[in-house]
Amino acid sequence: MTGIGEMFLAAFLQALFQTLVSEPFRSFFKRRELNENLLERLSTALLTITAVLIDAEEKQITNPVVEKWVNELRDVVYHAEDALDDIATEALRLNIGAESSSSNRLRQLRGRMSLGDFLDGNSEHLETRLEKVTIRLERLASQRNILGLKELTAMIPKQRLPTTSLVDESEVFGRDDDKDEIMRFLIPENGKDNGITVVAIVGIGGVGKTTLSQLLYNDQHVRSYFGTKVWAHVSEEFDVFKITKKVYESVTSRPCEFTDLDVLQVKLKERLTGTGLPFLLVLDDLWNENFADWDLLRQPFIHAAQGSQILVTTRSQRVASIMCAVHVHNLQPLSDGDCWSLFMKTVFGNQEPCLNREIGDLAERIVHKCRGLPLAVKTLGGVLRFEGKVIEWERVLSSRIWDLPADKSNLLPVLRVSYYYLPAHLKRCFAYCSIFPKGHAFEKDKVVLLWMAEGFLQQTRSSKNLEELGNEYFSELESRSLLQKTKTRYIMHDFINELAQFASGEFSSKFEDGCKLQVSERTRYLSYLRDNYAEPMEFEALREVKFLRTFLPLSLTNSSRSCCLDQMVSEKLLPTLTRLRVLSLSHYKIARLPPDFFKNISHARFLDLSRTELEKLPKSLCYMYNLQTLLLSYCSSLKELPTDISNLINLRYLDLIGTKLRQMPRRFGRLKSLQTLTTFFVSASDGSRISELGGLHDLHGKLKIVELQRVVDVADAAEANLNSKKHLREIDFVWRTGSSSSENNTNPHRTQNEAEVFEKLRPHRHIEKLAIERYKGRRFPDWLSDPSFSRIVCIRLRECQYCTSLPSLGQLPCLKELHISGMVGLQSIGRKFYFSDQQLRDQDQQPFRSLETLRFDNLPDWQEWLDVRVTRGDLFPSLKKLFILRCPELTGTLPTFLPSLISLHIYKCGLLDFQPDHHEYSYRNLQTLSIKSSCDTLVKFPLNHFANLDKLEVDQCTSLYSLELSNEHLRGPNALRNLRINDCQNLQLLPKLNALPQNLQVTITNCRYLRQPMEQQPQYHHPQFHLPRSNVSGSPKSHGSHRSYDSRSSSRYD
């Protein structure tokens, strides 16, 4: 199989050079007199090979000998990386040993030792390996002339056939809606300002961007609207002069004689502004992401006639962004039905398709294989054109893109260009994604962690951390349509997946259902689909794979179901794979691992043990000094971490969600590389105190701090230094009910100490989300009311049962969500909820000016919600959703004016007084209203008081007597679509349904005093009405059943 190698290998070689020129490695070579030339030999061989890599990439496509040379080079580079990694790992081990030494004198002595000192004992073996690697590289370098490889300074793109504006519309299916959507922007109903705007069509290679632009270009409305149309196929070469010249020749209808760009652009500008007619320029297949080039090209068009447009097709979202497109149309794959029509047209032309059952079944599977890609449909259909042999159809079905006949397929060249022009650092990342099975949806963060483990993220000239670089790389691939976002995850189109496999070659292997595991001695990356039980024989082939780096079981579903892994695999086979960098045993029913399981896997950077049944981790885990990622989420039996986990000084990501841990081991603060720590458990006496967080300066994302009742020393809390952790965005503070009397003590001294501790846990002002759960103090910290927390968007207060008042949160400028629940001591909400003591003097600021969701839940003693007047604006001016749930003692009314409220839910608030008459105008935008087991004073409900009400639910309102249409309002409830009434035992009056909207859904159940069933009102049966059904049950005349009636009738009319 042909592979793609040059820039892929260039990224490897760049990383190798960085290691070789680093001071520790140069010191190592200088200290060994017999090997002082080894470094120079190795560097020279690498430089010689690098010079011919560009030529090698081109020639390996058609020359099997060059392909073999490239694959041999990749294998040697992997071995070189392994050797250098051995040196770095040994240095790490000795450094950690020095730091852990109990002897200060020994620690100081070792601290002064060089890497060469560390390696004296093992240097002979390591130097022998490097010598072998150097010899292999020198041999490959010497073969460059024999293979005819030349030194090239730049990649020469292979010219593809240019596109034209012509299209055969009989061969286009399923693009009418796309065409209509883009036409709205090309020819808008309303006029536009002078100048030119850009519309972009973005999509994966082969999805039909050019075809769609051809349809638009040749549309009759487009021809009549635009005075001049120009089609320019740009491809990889963005030549401003050539494009400008072509536009000029199209506008003037004569050859261009100008050779100076400035003169040409001036002349073109004069012609465009002089005609007064809009023009259309199509730039097909645009790749250039240089804003300066685009800015130069657009200069003559800036003052073009009103309505002028540039239509761009590109695979890159970034191109569309750079060109400031007013509309970006993300072109989606065709439906299976449209693909079938195109396939039949391609295979049989204008003849009637003639398919027997066997070929018909194969045809459906081939069409499905194309996954909506028109180019793939036409390519596979073209290979089978008028082909009647079943064996040929089966061959095409099972073929991969590189297996198709070169003279009949342009699918691979079209897709390959997406890879060809990737930067070097992205090629390795993209090729690695070949380990994902077709159809597998993957998480962005996990892929970044895998790339990081494999060493693909290079910080050469960047101040960004590895995770930020990985996210940047991922976004680049997504922008280029190589990765596609679903609702929550990402996928690769099947043919892009094959392209990645094509790029990765024999170094990557997938073990999928129904396939035999195919690996070679060169295989470095392996994934397979988990099954209920993995047979040992399925993994026998791995005994020959001595240099495997990735062992990754996957699932095509998001199921959390656990599987079984044979003990032979987990305890005998895996420990022999000493070069592993990625190891996952996630979702396996593993209760224990041998004590020395990780002893020989010291190179691993990524370890996923999530959703296993492990009760404790082997101590040998603490010798994995290179480990960067440790996933232990939902290990529901795991009760403790190894004592010496602090040795993992390179650990960056530790996920402890869903474990049974109750404390962290001692010296946890030594893990200074941590970027993500999901949970920190404050220890009681023999573990890590909260002060251990103080040294973890680089924590990002979300942190949950649990067992805060164990913090009794205010100084400890201050040393946690939460206010210095500027990268944290979410913090959950959680107290628990402790088992000891001291932890349960709620005397005034104890609660005062809790408040003082919490005051010292002030987070950085960049925090965005806060949750406080089971806090045992009597007052919230002052910092919680500080308006300098300008980024907080969400606060959750749960079961803070000793607090009798809420913190002053009204002046947090960006707060959008506030959830308050389980505060049994809260009785009143008043002015201090909106303003702090200092802010009470100045009430000009609108309280809660950004709040959109407010939820009160399970506040059993809450009695009053005092209304507050402000000198400017309204309370809650942005509030959209209000929930008041399980507040049985709450009396009085709701805030009088909530102009933005669209959803109101009241549940089990019997004493709350809600009268629609009082809120008709103040809640004018209300769309959803739900009142359940609440508002005992509610007797009548005028349906037409809320003009925008879409959904009304009333359940167990004991006093409700009537739903009516108020006579003072001529309008009806025209927006109402769903009316649900249940168990309102005193309800007796309903409005005539012919006065309600025709498409209203009405459900009425268990309302026993509705005295007249709806079907007995014939005066409202008008033929022009056709309303959906109304369900009434539980009334005396419905015999207790749930019956359906035509809703053109009415219950007892008023």
Curated annotation (Swiss-Prot):
<feature type="repeat" description="LRR 5">
    <location>
        <begin position="676"/>
        <end position="697"/>
    </location>
</feature>
<dbReference type="InterPro" id="IPR032675">
    <property type="entry name" value="LRR_dom_sf"/>
</dbReference>
<keyword id="KW-0175">Coiled coil</keyword>
<dbReference type="Pfam" id="PF00931">
    <property type="entry name" value="NB-ARC"/>
</dbReference>
<dbReference type="InterPro" id="IPR056789">
    <property type="entry name" value="LRR_R13L1-DRL21"/>
</dbReference>
<dbReference type="GO" id="GO:0043531">
    <property type="term" value="F:ADP binding"/>
</dbReference>
<dbReference type="InterPro" id="IPR027417">
    <property type="entry name" value="P-loop_NTPase"/>
</dbReference>
<comment type="function">
    <text>Potential disease resistance protein.</text>
</comment>
<dbReference type="InterPro" id="IPR001611">
    <property type="entry name" value="Leu-rich_rpt"/>
</dbReference>
<keyword id="KW-0433">Leucine-rich repeat</keyword>
<feature type="region of interest" description="Leucine-zipper 2">
    <location>
        <begin position="39"/>
        <end position="53"/>
    </location>
</feature>
<dbReference type="GO" id="GO:0005524">
    <property type="term" value="F:ATP binding"/>
</dbReference>
<keyword id="KW-0547">Nucleotide-binding</keyword>
<keyword id="KW-0611">Plant defense</keyword>
<dbReference type="Pfam" id="PF18052">
    <property type="entry name" value="Rx_N"/>
</dbReference>
<keyword id="KW-0067">ATP-binding</keyword>
<dbReference type="InterPro" id="IPR036388">
    <property type="entry name" value="WH-like_DNA-bd_sf"/>
</dbReference>
<feature type="region of interest" description="Disordered">
    <location>
        <begin position="1018"/>
        <end position="1054"/>
    </location>
</feature>
<dbReference type="InterPro" id="IPR003591">
    <property type="entry name" value="Leu-rich_rpt_typical-subtyp"/>
</dbReference>
<feature type="region of interest" description="Leucine-zipper 1">
    <location>
        <begin position="9"/>
        <end position="20"/>
    </location>
</feature>
<dbReference type="GO" id="GO:0098542">
    <property type="term" value="P:defense response to other organism"/>
</dbReference>
<feature type="binding site">
    <location>
        <begin position="203"/>
        <end position="210"/>
    </location>
    <ligand>
        <name>ATP</name>
    </ligand>
</feature>
<dbReference type="InterPro" id="IPR042197">
    <property type="entry name" value="Apaf_helical"/>
</dbReference>
<feature type="domain" description="NB-ARC">
    <location>
        <begin position="152"/>
        <end position="462"/>
    </location>
</feature>
<feature type="repeat" description="LRR 2">
    <location>
        <begin position="603"/>
        <end position="624"/>
    </location>
</feature>
<feature type="compositionally biased region" description="Basic and acidic residues">
    <location>
        <begin position="1043"/>
        <end position="1054"/>
    </location>
</feature>
<dbReference type="InterPro" id="IPR002182">
    <property type="entry name" value="NB-ARC"/>
</dbReference>
<feature type="repeat" description="LRR 3">
    <location>
        <begin position="626"/>
        <end position="648"/>
    </location>
</feature>
<feature type="coiled-coil region">
    <location>
        <begin position="117"/>
        <end position="147"/>
    </location>
</feature>
<comment type="similarity">
    <text>Belongs to the disease resistance NB-LRR family. RPP13 subfamily.</text>
</comment>
<feature type="repeat" description="LRR 1">
    <location>
        <begin position="579"/>
        <end position="600"/>
    </location>
</feature>
<dbReference type="Pfam" id="PF13855">
    <property type="entry name" value="LRR_8"/>
</dbReference>
<protein>
    <recommendedName>
        <fullName>Putative disease resistance RPP13-like protein 1</fullName>
    </recommendedName>
</protein>
<dbReference type="Pfam" id="PF23559">
    <property type="entry name" value="WH_DRP"/>
</dbReference>
<dbReference type="Pfam" id="PF25019">
    <property type="entry name" value="LRR_R13L1-DRL21"/>
</dbReference>
<feature type="repeat" description="LRR 4">
    <location>
        <begin position="650"/>
        <end position="672"/>
    </location>
</feature>
<dbReference type="InterPro" id="IPR041118">
    <property type="entry name" value="Rx_N"/>
</dbReference>
<keyword id="KW-0677">Repeat</keyword>
